[in-house]
Swiss-Prot record:
Disulfide links within the chain: none
Membrane topology according to the record: Multi-pass membrane protein
Source organism: Dictyostelium discoideum (Social amoeba)
Subcellular location per the Swiss-Prot or TrEMBL entry: Membrane
GO CC terms, sorted: membrane
Transmembrane intervals: 10-30, 94-114, 134-154, 196-216
Name under which the protein is recorded: Uncharacterized transmembrane protein DDB_G0287341
Keywords: Membrane, Transmembrane, Transmembrane helix
UniProt xrefs under InterPro entries: DDB_G0287341-like (IPR040291)
């Protein structure tokens, strides 16, 4: 019963973690938006920039009828620092996703009785050790990767500002209200801060942290029934061989 309870909890937790990472990839991570109340026309939302997994959208109008219009394709200066951070975010978040996928896939294989290295004399002990490492190591890796990614996204405003400094200097950039210094905030004209992708990743990171602790405390339960069966079969086979001899 303990093993079954652990399996259900395990697959529920990591199924949710996996799904949250998928939604993170599909959602915008950070945005800077012009306040609506300074416009007479209310039929659209204006985003100065919107950062997603595969692109950065600049000056985008979302109309009620679904039409989209872009009238600028860059910040007006090179964004090498921002692009470097974006690349790091993509790599780390993808590795976190692959780590979670690997864990789910590997445990499924384990439970459909596909044999790897367990056909040895010490298969029970070796198998349990391997799976304890997998069950603790994979979520721990995913947690650290997601945690680092969270802080990389926090660095997006600083990256934009630093790129502006390189092109125009601090005096000009500091006079531009858009090139703000905080991760989240607003002024007379702009609202800026994390979008729903960052919030999803934060929830995913917290959930992965607790899932890691759960696996660490209960990893032995995941294979206890299977290993008991393996040990029983192994002993029976040895007894049969001895009887034949």
């Amino acid at each position: 019963m303990n093993s079954l309870k652990f399996k259900l909890t395990f697959y529920t937790l990591f199924g949710l973690i996996w799904s949250l990472l998928v939604f993170f990839f599909l959602s915008p991570w950070y945005e800077e938006t012009l306040k609506k109340d300074i416009f007479e026309l209310k039929q659209y939302k204006f985003s100065n920039f919107l950062i997603l997994y595969d692109k950065i959208e600049y000056n985008k109008f979302d109309y009620v009828d679904g039409a989209e219009t872009y009238f600028r394709d860059a910040f007006g200066f090179e964004t090498k620092t921002l692009e470097g951070i974006m690349t790091s975010i993509k790599v780390l978040s993808t590795l976190a996703f692959l780590s979670t996928t690997f864990l789910i896939y590997f445990t499924i294989i384990f439970y459909v009785h596909i044999k790897f290295i367990f056909d040895t004399e010490n298969h029970r002990r070796l198998g349990k050790k391997v799976w304890c490492y997998v069950l603790i190591g994979s979520p721990l890796v995913s947690f650290f990767l997601s945690f680092i990614t969270l802080f990389l996204i926090i660095g997006i405003p600083s990256a934009v500002r630093n790129d502006c400094y390189k092109e125009y200097g601090k005096k000009f950039c500091n006079s531009q209200l858009r090139y703000h210094t905080s991760f989240i905030g607003e002024n007379q004209v702009w609202l800026w801060g994390p979008s729903r992708g960052w919030i999803i990743l934060m929830v995913d990171t917290i959930l992965t942290f607790f899932a890691t602790i759960y696996c660490w405390r209960n990893a032995h339960k995941f294979d206890e029934v299977k290993m008991k069966k393996k040990k029983k079969n192994y002993l029976n086979n040895n007894n049969n061989k001895n009887n034949i001899l």
